[in-house]
């Protein structure tokens, strides 16, 4: 992916978006309140003609995409800017894809790799997963200002750690038994950096970020969450991008409290433990579980406000039909998943 990261990253915008371009800015409200002091220095100047500057909404759904499509004069824009978290960015990417207008991203949290990928994860109006939209192109450029990200609520970095570790576990699982082409083999190798450096850096990164300290651990973790994960997503065969960690997340969204009360990467990280248990990857499970315990990522159903003895069939039904399980080394059934969930309930690392 094309990206610039650093304390003056936003000053690089002029190198990529010609002066006097017509632009539209769409943002998440809370994110923009923090980011505006940085973005205004470059975007709200005589260099650019701003045709729209508005909140995108609150979720990645087609109602919010349509709001962008209906902005007066939007078709004459030279560039769309998405300033916010993954749902804001996915919404703007989806709109840009329909309009054939280049999208530039300014992530305000390090929670997913949405700022650099060429997919948009769309939900229905109830917040239940709907579909993954394959876009024609990724964002033209991503501008990562670490001072914005380190001042965001710490829960987003925490969830991003969970989402990022899943990439390595899922891609190696999905690609197992296949003869890989060069780019997929390279992408899966890069994916190791979504896991091992995170194991090493995560605890210190969270401690430092709580104090707004831009340590090496914080910067490496931000880069691995946004850029390394995005690299894997962009260059491997799309069928290798996910597996049970994400499929179970999408299944869990049938319970409305999951989308309302839990973050994407937080829930995905639980799915990673379930996948490792199902696949009998006990050494990796032990390492991952230990980090979850250390930093408070979920390790059991109760951490997601679910009970061991409740009926999970609605979740499991939605999980097994998810597209992320179309290309896996063996058939993943409801029974296999439930068995792994119950084993995880009894597991103690």
Where are these regions (language model features)?
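C-terminal charged capping/lid subdomain of soluble metabolic enzymes
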Residues: 281-349
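ATP/NTP phosphate-donor binding region
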Residues: 1-79, 301
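Solvent-exposed alpha-helices and their adjacent loops that cap or buttress functional pockets
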Residues: 16-17, 73-75, 96, 131-137, ...
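Short glycine/serine/threonine-rich phosphate/pyrophosphate-binding segments
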Residues: 33-36, 87-94, 112-116, 241
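A short, small-residue-rich loop immediately preceding and capping a beta-strand
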Residues: 72-110
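Active-site segments that bind and position negatively charged phosphate/pyrophosphate groups
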Residues: 180-291
């Amino acid at each position: 992916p094309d990206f610039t990261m650093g304390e003056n990253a936003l000053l690089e915008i002029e190198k990529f978006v010609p002066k006097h371009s017509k632009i539209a800015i769409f943002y998440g409200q809370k994110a923009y309140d923090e980011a505006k002091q940085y973005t205004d220095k470059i975007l709200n100047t005589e260099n650019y003609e701003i045709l729209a500057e508005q909140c995108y909404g609150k979720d990645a759904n087609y109602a919010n995409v349509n709001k962008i499509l209906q902005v007066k004069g939007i078709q004459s824009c030279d560039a769309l800017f998405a300033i916010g978290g993954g749902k804001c960015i996915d919404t703007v990417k989806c709109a840009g894809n329909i309009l054939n207008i280049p999208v530039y991203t300014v992530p305000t949290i390090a929670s997913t790799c949405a700022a650099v990928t060429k997919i948009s994860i769309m939900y229905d109006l109830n917040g239940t997963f709907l579909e993954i939209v394959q876009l024609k192109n990724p964002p033209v450029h991503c501008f990562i200002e670490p001072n914005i990200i380190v001042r965001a609520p710490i829960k987003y970095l925490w969830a991003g750690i969970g989402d990022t570790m899943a990439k390595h576990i899922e891609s190696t699982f999905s690609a197992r038994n296949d003869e890989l082409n060069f780019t997929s083999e390279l992408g899966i190798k890069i994916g190791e950096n979504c896991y091992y450096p995170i194991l090493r850096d995560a605890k210190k990164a969270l401690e430092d970020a709580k104090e707004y300290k831009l340590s090496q651990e914080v910067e490496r973790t931000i880069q691995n969450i946004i850029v390394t994960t995005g690299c894997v997503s962009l260059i491997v065969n799309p069928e290798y991008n996910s597996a049970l960690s994400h499929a179970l997340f999408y299944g869990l969204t049938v319970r409305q409290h999951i989308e309302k009360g839990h973050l994407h990467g937080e829930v995905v990280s639980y799915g990673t433990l379930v996948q490792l248990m199902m696949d009998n990857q006990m050494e990796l499970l032990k390492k991952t579980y230990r980090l979850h315990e250390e930093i408070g990522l979920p390790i059991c159903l109760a951490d997601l406000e679910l009970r061991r003895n409740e009926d999970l069939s609605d979740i499991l039904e939605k999980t097994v039909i998810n597209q992320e399980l179309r290309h896996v080394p063996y058939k993943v059934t409801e029974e296999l998943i439930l068995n792994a969930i119950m084993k995880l309930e009894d597991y103690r690392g």
